Amino acid sequence: MVKLAKAGKNQGDPKKMAPPPKEVEEDSEDEEMSEDEEDDSSGEEVVIPQKKGKKAAATSAKKVVVSPTKKVAVATPAKKAAVTPGKKAAATPAKKTVTPAKAVATPGKKGATPGKALVATPGKKGAAIPAKGAKNGKNAKKEDSDEEEEDDSEEDDEDDEDEDEDEDEIEPAVMKAAAAAPASEDEDDEDDEDDEDEDDDDEEDDSEEEAMETTPAKGKKAAKVVPVKAKNVAEDEDEEEDDEDEDDDDDEDDEDEDDDDEDEEEEEEEEEPVKEAPGKRKKEMAKQKAAPEAKKQKVEGTEPTTAFNLFVGNLNFNKSAPELKTGISDVFAKNDLAVVDVRIGMTRKFGYVDFESAEDLEKALELTGLKVFGNEIKLEKPKGKDSKKERDARTLLAKNLPYKVTQDELKEVFEDAAEIRLVSKDGKSKGIAYIEFKTEADAEKTFEEKQGTEIDGRSISLYYTGEKGQNQDYRGGKNSTWSGESKTLVLSNLSYSATEETLQEVFEKATFIKVPQNQNGKSKGYAFIEFASFEDAKEALNSCNKREIEGRAIRLELQGPRGSPNARSQPSKTLFVKGLSEDTTEETLKESFDGSVRARIVTDRETGSSKGFGFVDFNSEEDAKAAKEAMEDGEIDGNKVTLDWAKPKGEGGFGGRGGGRGGFGGRGGGRGGRGGFGGRGRGGFGGRGGFRGGRGGGGDHKPQGKKTKFE
């Protein structure tokens, strides 16, 4: 407890204390003796001895000092004083340090020392209140009135409980009052050795306490001193006291600060920064959102000065805007082109140049290789809001390009192209490119002349983009509608190792070849072969169908129109069979159809298990029709199967009408059906409803794989 009394030793002068009230005059002799001792020992200390002896007075006074230093009403040091005789009444004057002159030095009735409250002047009213008291006089007045009422109730020194409750009520005011009182907080220690130690400590803290030596007057100036003093006292007492009450007071101070004016808050922050409450931050953020900054302009300057504008890209952004303007103007001036204005973008990576006439603009577009500050600039017409439709009309999409082709190689083929953009993914070419021309007429001319041109052994296909491309036949080159003469073949049963290059060697007249791949970059087992005319497609169908490619006999058929409801109803030489049992083999499938020449079951490449569907080939469409009629509603290995004409990607893939009716597994899905336990015939062991769960049932078995969709 010795270290706690050092905080305000050098603050205060006995001459400045208020005249004592009537209660103090009764013990005037004792007070005069204490004043003489104070003048002899240290001109700044005020020690009032107790009647029982100098040492006892110092002890009781020391206990009293701790109370105002630690918020007074925290009910910690003041209550400790009640343990020893003669100190019980000391808590009362310690509390009354926050009252006006009336209670400045009210001693206890039992003769205890008045707790060195003599220095508290009327001007202390402003300093004895927390930060909010300095800002708002109403709070100070309210607390003063409460203190006066408490003085009357505290005349009975034996009622300790009432005193503690009253102290808790005015706790915020008392805490700051004790912090601001100049010399009333310092007393001698219990013995002379403690006094010497305290003097040494006070010399170290003189620099910190100089700001508190003058008694603060009413107003905001007192509030500036409060946070510093309170902070120093709190730091000294953290070692011995519990700070829970102090934290509560700090929270109350923060809430009060939120309600004060911003100007008053700024004054306090100049003296001691105070932690902002969360509510205050939210208010500031709301103000910032309410007044957002104006959006930055993308281009410095105003609207174009003329209608003849030129976009300039790839500028050296390390240069300032004025330097770029001067450099661009000089470059065009060297080419006898007068520049009206130059507007630089905010990023300084691009800009716009305004010319006087369309002739100057056209001449500028013809310039190439111009450099500004070491960067070769890019010149083109600005892209307006309505220019996308125009660009699409003069842009072609080239497919089936070699993956290693470069822009320079394409430039040799498309000499009239204004811009060539190769499409790539993850740094790898996708075999397609966009070819943009200066005019729509150039695009149409190239479309007719370059369709099917070979590049590195691959025949390229050209397509329109935009609205023209929507009316164009899928993979069909020119605009057309379905007339029953498709130019595209669908190739199935393709080896997974086959590539587009392999198919190009087989189908030499093909203009476009696509082998769909999965996410791992592997073939899905089918392909699309496009030709320049229906005759070429028909010829390839007759000559290459069932040819072996890398160990597998391929199947070819003409592609019907996409989305046609009757596409699957067209007969062919191949039947599509779904609803197969997991145990059905290709031999069993082939034997189930009279006249069949080949059968294949689609399996999962990872697990090798059947996907529940397959294909059966015949020598002619007539044989296929007969087999289809014979096996309609038939069963294979106990499963009822569904038959249809083989057709790649239609309105719902192989999953029936829109993928409904159970997908691959018959009506309602799964493996059910009427089939029995075994055999090919109808009925079998289980009769209708069968062993595995009847119509639509999947029983206890897992579904038969994923639906395969063609692209």
Swiss-Prot record:
Q: Does the keyword DNA damage apply?
A: no
List membrane-spanning regions.
none
Composition bias, Acidic residues: 24-43, 145-171, 184-212, 235-273
**Region entry Disordered: which residue ranges?**
1-304, 641-711
Sites bearing N6-acetyllysine, chain numbering = 9, 15-16, 96, 102, 109, 116, 124, 319, 349, 378, 399, 404, 428, 445, 468, 478, 514, 522, 573, 578, 647
Specify residue ranges for compositional bias: Basic and acidic residues. 274-301, 698-711
Q: Where are the Phosphoserine modifications?
A: 28, 34, 41-42, 67, 145, 153, 184, 207, 357, 459, 461, 564, 581, 592, 620
Per the database record, which ranges form the RRM domain?
Answer: 308-384, 394-467, 487-561, 573-648
Q: Which UniProt keywords apply?
A: Acetylation, Cytoplasm, DNA-binding, Isopeptide bond, Methylation, Nucleus, Phosphoprotein, Repeat, RNA-binding, Ubl conjugation
Q: What does this protein do?
A: Nucleolin is the major nucleolar protein of growing eukaryotic cells. It is found associated with intranucleolar chromatin and pre-ribosomal particles. It induces chromatin decondensation by binding to histone H1. It is thought to play a role in pre-rRNA transcription and ribosome assembly. May play a role in the process of transcriptional elongation. Binds RNA oligonucleotides with 5'-UUAGGG-3' repeats more tightly than the telomeric single-stranded DNA 5'-TTAGGG-3' repeats.
Instruction: Describe the protein's quaternary organization and the partners it interacts with.
Output: Identified in a IGF2BP1-dependent mRNP granule complex containing untranslated mRNAs. Component of the SWAP complex that consists of NPM1, NCL/nucleolin, PARP1 and SWAP70. Component of a complex which is at least composed of HTATSF1/Tat-SF1, the P-TEFb complex components CDK9 and CCNT1, RNA polymerase II, SUPT5H, and NCL/nucleolin. Interacts with AICDA. Interacts with APTX. Interacts with C1QBP. Interacts with ERBB4. Interacts (via C-terminus) with FMR1 isoform 6 (via N-terminus). Interacts with GZF1; this interaction is important for nucleolar localization of GZF1. Interacts with NSUN2.
State what protein this is by name.
Answer: Nucleolin
Record organism: Macaca fascicularis
